[in-house]
Amino acid sequence: MTLEEARRRVNELRDLIRYHNYLYYVLDAPEISDAEYDRLLRELKELEERFPELKSPDSPTEQVGARPLEATFRPVRHPTRMYSLDNAFSLDEVRAFEERIERALGRKGPFLYTVERKVDGLSVNLYYEEGILVFGATRGDGETGEEVTQNLLTIPTIPRRLTGVPDRLEVRGEVYMPIEAFLRLNQELEEAGERIFKNPRNAAAGSLRQKDPRVTARRGLRATFYALGLGLEETGLKSQHDLLLWLRERGFPVEHGFTRALGAEGVEEVYQAWLKERRKLPFEADGVVVKLDDLALWRELGYTARTPRFALAYKFPAEEKETRLLSVAFQVGRTGRITPVGVLEPVFIEGSEVSRVTLHNESFIEELDVRIGDWVLVHKAGGVIPEVLRVLKERRTGEEKPIIWPENCPECGHALIKEGKVHRCPNPLCPAKRFEAIRHYASRKAMDIQGLGEKLIEKLLEKGLVRDVADLYRLKKEDLVNLERMGEKSAENLLRQIEESKGRGLERLLYALGLPGVGEVLARNLALRFGHMDRLLEAGLEDLLEVEGVGELTARAILNTLKDPEFRDLVRRLKEAGVEMEAKEREGEALKGLTFVITGELSRPREEVKALLRRLGAKVTDSVSRKTSFLVVGENPGSKLEKARALGVPTLSEEELYRLIEERTGKDPRALTA
């Protein structure tokens, strides 16, 4: 073996061992046996002994033991200061910013700016030495932050190793939680009666500060990077636009929409366009960041004690409104959980009137100290769900009244039970629980029983014709024709719809049954993982945690439901009625046995491509490993591409993927839907 061949193999082995260390020590999800791991480590040691010039202090052979599993959050000093940004809230303030630049530089504008979306997350700093990640830390006070390296490494797009960079380098960015992950996490926490997060930014901060990195890994955090600290001069970069491209080329995720704009008026055009698109984004964006594009001008302008003189945050208008909490209603969900709902003086927020707002659970009410009659500040969490941000206690008059939880179910009168901070109606005959369960089961995204509306469900329950969803399949024509406004034709149509619903498949059935924390996406993932209801009923906690999108709280809640005798009896009766318990066969199983990972931007939405691959029998994962069959590479790929090359994983362009699908199915993949 030549020195060059040894160098390539040593680098490959180090990457492999680091990757498996990460799986074992951080995610607690090893992919190889201890014996296979030992074989890799032994081969690396032998090569380093045979070629001592290849030894390196960062080699896994030089590290004593493993990284600690618990994050420590020790204070760490940033090599160079992290500054804040001045804010602007109007075009006039952006013009004033440009005028300050003109005066400082002694020349007239307009100047060229790079404009980037301002992702609302938590600022972090990554520090590399000789291309190796030494630590990652939060911004803190700008001088000193908290080390969160272990938790940052659970974000798969953060590179551990770089090539073609200065010896000492700081990379700055934002860690954030996508809106979908935020809503899912809050649903889990609410179901458990735990404290929920007010917004995705708080959720990201709380998730990054988990002591157990495995918890962080399940929270779905993402990162985007946009700046360099130490090492910027050594790169020789001339513009912010080029800096973003430079970061992307080295495997860092960079928010894809950045652009250039000329002068304050050009910035305003971009701002207005992005403001309209704000709610279409998968993450919270609270404005745009405006930076002089020419880095030489940065050096001329410098910094104040707190902020750079060459950059500005142009904030989107706050969609927060003040209103009064008039009363609180208590609703009974299909699982019996009691949810307090605040009745508000109507207020207009983000295009719609808001008159009701969830107060989640007892923990939320206690933490907020909200009372009937209070003035409250309301917004839409994730741009979707109306929520109380805070109580305006300075406006209290003394006439406000505390919120008193009922002792009995507001629907059936049965005594409520308390599980932690969750109030629940245990009555299996509670009409509200039955109504909500049947309504959800029949809904379009569940079993899609057209014609079974709310009024008809109420009549069926009132007449004692159904008690639960399994009874729907025992209905006969003579049961229905005597109901008000239900003729013979309508009865026949409804019975046909009920019969057709038997064949919807496991995915729709799981969503329809309302397992805790299980929405459409999770129902699909469970169906793909287990394939049949019988296998799901036998699943354990670890089996559920292997399913994409399932965190520990959701896994335990699902498991409790699966083991519940009433639920198992319901499933038995549905099976006897002929309801399909198996996942629907995926078209031709054309890609069965193949595992795909996707990186970069595709011409179709990524989730759509993932769903298509799964429908064709493939497995889709988020991280590259030796088990990956193909890495699909779109525009502006991330660090997964480098890892795939290190592991020898084949890559496909989007077009090559579609050609593969066409070869396997004989159909144009663009005509196939997920």
UniProtKB/Swiss-Prot annotation:
List of residues binding NAD(+): 34-38, 84-85, 116, 139, 174, 291, 315
Active site: 118 (n6-amp-lysine intermediate)
Enzyme class: ligase
Residue ranges of every copy of the BRCT domain listed in the record: 586-674
Nucleotidyltransferase is among the record's keywords: no
Family annotation (NCBIfam families): dnlj, PRK07956.1
Essential cofactor(s): Mg(2+); Mn(2+)
One of the GO BP terms on file: DNA repair
The organism's taxonomic lineage, starting at the top: Bacteria, Thermotogati, Deinococcota, Deinococci, Thermales
Binding site for Zn(2+): 409, 412, 425, 430
GO-annotated molecular function: DNA binding; DNA ligase (NAD+) activity; metal ion binding
Pfam families linked: BRCT (PF00533), DNA_ligase_aden (PF01653), DNA_ligase_OB (PF03120), HHH_2 (PF12826), HHH_5 (PF14520), Nlig-Ia (PF22745)
Name of this chain's protein: DNA ligase
PROSITE patterns, per the entry: BRCT, DNA_LIGASE_N1, DNA_LIGASE_N2
Gene3D superfamilies noted in UniProt: 3.30.1490.70, 5' to 3' exonuclease, C-terminal subdomain, 6.20.10.30, BRCT domain, DNA ligase/mRNA capping enzyme, Helix hairpin bin, Nucleic acid-binding proteins
Family: Belongs to the NAD-dependent DNA ligase family. LigA subfamily.
Catalytic activity: NAD(+) + (deoxyribonucleotide)n-3'-hydroxyl + 5'-phospho-(deoxyribonucleotide)m = (deoxyribonucleotide)n+m + AMP + beta-nicotinamide D-nucleotide
